Amino acid sequence: MVNEYKKILLLKGFELMDDYHFTSIKSLLAYDLGLTTKMQEEYNRIKITDLMEKKFQGVACLDKLIELAKDMPSLKNLVNNLRKEKSKVAKKIKTQEKAPVKKINQEEVGLAAPAPTARNKLTSEARGRIPVAQKRKTPNKEKTEAKRNKVSQEQSKPPGPSGASTSAAVDHPPLPQTSSSTPSNTSFTPNQETQAQRQVDARRNVPQNDPVTVVVLKATAPFKYESPENGKSTMFHATVASKTQYFHVKVFDINLKEKFVRKKVITISDYSECKGVMEIKEASSVSDFNQNFEVPNRIIEIANKTPKISQLYKQASGTMVYGLFMLQKKSVHKKNTIYEIQDNTGSMDVVGSGKWHNIKCEKGDKLRLFCLQLRTVDRKLKLVCGSHSFIKVIKAKKNKEGPMNVN
């Protein structure tokens, strides 16, 4: 099935831009897509579209273009048109999702026997115990009984997660955003991740069968984390780079730690990609690559570069962030701690909860962040710790990193 949002991105977006605006968009996307100067010069509209589809899957790729283009006055009409086309696709998907429901309702009227779902199984069994003649004579009674069954089932259902929202995109909807009514000291612990959010992440996890050869740039020591699916476990983060791009990596198989040594060249296969981050699990394969392999310095520079805070405010909610930031202020609350990070372009709050609540650090220290997520809290974009997040403190005076060493 054709990705409708990708189709709009290319045909109604890039193809209708002049070269100047397309070049401007490529420049703004350079960090997210890992584009070198040469890539920015050579990559055409189709290539950039393919990269955006991979990096920002589903509706997120179109949202990204709208986010960048809306600040360009001459592209106002194009942005409005993109929003209209996006709305059309969302309505189309919503209609398709409703279609099976309508069919079931028709079948319940008497066109055919409905599929044995949890809801209609009770009513169909009840009808089976009523003679046909009696069914025809007491339609009102049957409707009353069906309503009673429906209410009973709904009352027996566990309450759904409040405030959770999903997008119309079928393969990569944006992360549910925190309600604007959430207080700033709300604790975002792993246990509060709803089932709906975990299902969204599962849909985003895209298997990658093609092997990729990379050089290891850095890796953290293993650390413990807790998730609703796996309970307590151990993982580590790494950054690797191929000849054309770099990857942030989550490694869930600790036995592979010896493979992730700085400057070591390895080949990775059977991995998956979730929210733009490579994930390596027990089913993945990591092997040594014993041939000459050189990565352009430009790729390494981009991989090690920390994004500017002003640039983070332009990213979509749900974006994963890595980097080294200066701590300006620390505010400890009952359930979480707000770490205010700052650079020469602005400041942003980091919401630390769970094991990252009130860590030992002070103004002037540097925080190396791994896998924190941009989320909207109180109508303001903030960095929020998740179950796979990791924060390393680099003390200002001693100029030494915290207990976790980087290879």
UniProtKB/Swiss-Prot annotation:
Residue stretches of biased makeup (Low complexity): 177-190
Pfam families hit by this protein: HIN, PYRIN
Lineage: Eukaryota, Metazoa, Chordata, Craniata, Vertebrata
One Gene Ontology MF term: double-stranded DNA binding
Organism name: Homo sapiens (Human)
Domain Pyrin: from-to ranges: 1-88
Subunit structure: Participates in a ternary complex with YY1 and the YY1 target DNA element. Binds nucleolin and nucleophosmin/NPM/B23.
Name of protein: Myeloid cell nuclear differentiation antigen
Highest taxon, organism lineage: Eukaryota
Inducing stimuli: Strongly induced by alpha interferon which selectively affects expression in late stage cells in the monocytic but not the granulocytic lineage. Induced in vitro by dimethylsulfoxide and 1,25 dihydroxyvitamin D3.
Role, per record: May act as a transcriptional activator/repressor in the myeloid lineage. Plays a role in the granulocyte/monocyte cell-specific response to interferon. Stimulates the DNA binding of the transcriptional repressor protein YY1.
Subcellular location: Nucleus; Cytoplasm
Tissue specificity annotation: Expressed constitutively in cells of the myeloid lineage. Found in promyelocyte stage cells as well as in all other stage cells including peripheral blood monocytes and granulocytes. Also appears in myeloblast cells in some cases of acute myeloid Leukemia.
Gene name for this UniProt entry: MNDA
